[in-house]
Structures are given as C-alpha cells and as structure tokens.
A protein has these predicted regions:
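ATP-binding/phosphotransfer module of carbohydrate and carboxylate kinases, centering on a glycine-rich
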Residues: 1, 15, 38-42, 106-107, ...
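Glycine-rich phosphate-binding loop and adjoining helix at the ATP-binding site
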Residues: 1-68, 205-216
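Short secondary-structure boundary segments
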Residues: 7, 48, 74-76, 125-126, ...
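Residues that form or immediately flank small-molecule/cofactor binding pockets and catalytic motifs
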Residues: 23, 49-51, 93, 107, ...
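Structural motif
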Residues: 61-64, 94, 185, 221
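Glycine-rich phosphate-binding loop of actin/hexokinase-like ATP-binding domains
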Residues: 64-123
Length: 236
C-alpha cells in the first residue's frame, strides 16, 4: 500500500519533490511527499496531474488498447500527456507536455508564464469564461447566458442548444486547440488523441472544429485515421 499525489506544475519524480506549482510562490522545492509519508507511515509518491491522467487513461480508459497516445487536458491550465510504446514519455528532465505554453496569438494576453498569447490564455476554462464575459459586455446576445451566469458548463450547455455566441466561441477554441495538436501529431503520430476537461461537454461542436483544423494543418497520413475521443476519467 502506498499514497500517490498528483499536482500541476513542475515535478521531479526522481527526488519526489514539487519544484513549481501554478499560482503558488515556492521559493524552494516542496517536500510534500515526505511530510505525508511521515504523517501516515506509508510510502508516498508525487506525480504530475496531466501525465498521471494520461497514464491512468492508458491503463483503465480509452487508450488501453493503444501503443501510443496523446492526451490534452484543459482545466485551469492546459497540458499534455504522451504515451509511447506503452510507456509514459517524461524526458530527461522529467517535465514535458507543456503544450499550453505554445504561442497561438502573438498579440494576445499575457500568460502567467511571462509569454504572450499562449494556448492557455485562449482555451483554459477561465480564458473561455472571460472571453464570453467580454462578448456579452460588448452586446452579443444569448438566450442561455448572462453576465451573472456564464461559467464553462453553462457555455457548453448553451453551445449544445445551438446558441450562436457560445457555439462561435467553442469553435474558436477548437480551432486553436487543433493548430497546436497538429504540431504534436506531426511530431509524435499518436495512435489516438484524447481530450479531457469540462469543455468536452460541448464535444460535438468542439471536436468538429478540432478535426477540421487537424485535417488542414497536420500531415494527412498521420491524422486521417486517428481517433479523437473524450477522456473517460476527466473528472475523477
């Protein structure tokens, strides 16, 4: 028996230390695993949340039948987990998959990483909610959304009901995701692509936009028969 803890940010799985966590100011690496191990008298291990999700999906979810897969997780941030030949790809420095910090808009908003126009500033839950707020303030009309009620789940539900402003926003998000995924597909040629997060509640609109962009930006031979599916473990 052991304890496993997953966190966002930068994790050194060799030393079991947390090096960086978004929105937290860590002046030195955080030895959380050791504190938990001492408290419960059990071996404790630290892992990255998105990469751990990709591995869990490979063991128990929609990619358990795949040699290679690419998982994109969208929540407060945006990250990727890559499985190659049944093994999680972690790289020499053990921190890979920061797909949310690929620039998609050179004139866009400042990202928490310090760069401008990262994918995360466009497609994270908060980015989508903030963009919808701006659209509503600018006079765009929605039967299902208001300035008081436009969280990510409400936006997805509105899109599913063919609300014009919600659908247009989800399509824009899908296009930006598709552009970045196309780069990843050209590099890794995954057997299957998995999308995880609340935004998959609008997967009919979202996936159509992603697929269109993938087909126009990625190598046809790499993307032609590559399934695009929603995670089965998104909120677990």
């Amino acid at each position: 028996i052991a304890i496993g803890i997953t966190v966002p940010g930068f994790v050194d799985v060799k030393s079991n230390m947390i090096e960086q966590v978004p929105h937290f100011d860590l002046s030195t690496p955080w030895d959380l695993a050791n504190h938990v191990a001492e408290r419960f008298n059990l071996p404790t291990y630290i892992g990255h949340d998105v990469r751990s999700l990709a591995l869990a999906e490979h063991y128990f979810g929609v990619t358990k039948d795949c040699y290679d897969s690419l998982l994109l997780r969208i929540h407060r941030g945006v990250g990727a987990g890559i499985v190659i030949n049944h093994e999680l790809f972690s790289g020499y420095k053990r921190n890979v998959g920061e797909i949310g910090h690929i620039q998609v808009d050179p004139l866009g908003k400042r990202c928490m990483c310090g760069n401008v126009g990262c994918l995360e500033t466009v497609v994270s839950n908060s980015a989508i909610e903030n963009k919808m707020s701006e659209l509503l303030e600018d006079g765009y009309q929605s039967k299902w959304l208001s300035l008081e009620a436009h969280d990510i789940e409400a936006i997805c539900k509105a899109s599913n009901k063919q609300d014009a402003v919600a659908t247009e926003l989800i399509e824009h998000v899908g296009t930006q995701i598709g552009r970045v995924l196309a780069m990843s597909v050209n590099m890794f040629n995954p057997e299957k692509i998995v999308i995880s997060g609340e935004i998959t509640q609008a997967k009919n609109v979202l996936f159509a936009a992603i697929r269109r962009t993938l087909e126009s930006h990625a190598l046809p031979a790499f993307v032609q028969n590559t399934p695009l599916v929603a995670s089965e473990l998104s909120n677990e």
